Amino acid sequence: MLEDNPRRIAAHTAGLPRNRVHKTPVLGEWTVNDVLAHLRSCSDARGEFMRSMLAEQRPTLRAVDPRTLLEQTGYRELEFGPSLRSFVRQRARLLAFLRALPRKSWSRTAVVTGGGPARERTVLFYARWLAHHERAHVRRLARTLQPAPARNSSSGM
């Protein structure tokens, strides 16, 4: 899934005009560009969590609200095409990093604070979390971008 999600986003948005990428489909919802910015910021943060778990012995990490991450990155202000290409490159680096891990590294842990009680998480937990989190957004994006059904203009005569 981690490998497929950027490709699915690219497939769903291929040929989409710029105004559609930056247009809110429904009042109060995110634009296509906002969704990509959110996924990039989550991937950055969870990738850093996994790297910290491997670099340190059971580090304590502070969870950050996804909306805060989104605002800190500036990804929303980027043009969609270059941002998607950056996401694809970032994902390739993350996958190369994860594929090189020895089996025992997937169980390395961290204590995560913020957003509730402290909890212990593993590298595997965050890799799975990221894949499932993205998949939900990609599915929603696919539904949002589906063309509206054609209306039957015949009057029944």
Predicted features and spans:
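General structural signal for secondary-structure boundaries
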Residues: P17, D65, E79, P102-K104, ...
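Short, contiguous alpha-helical
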Residues: H22-R67, L95, S107-M157
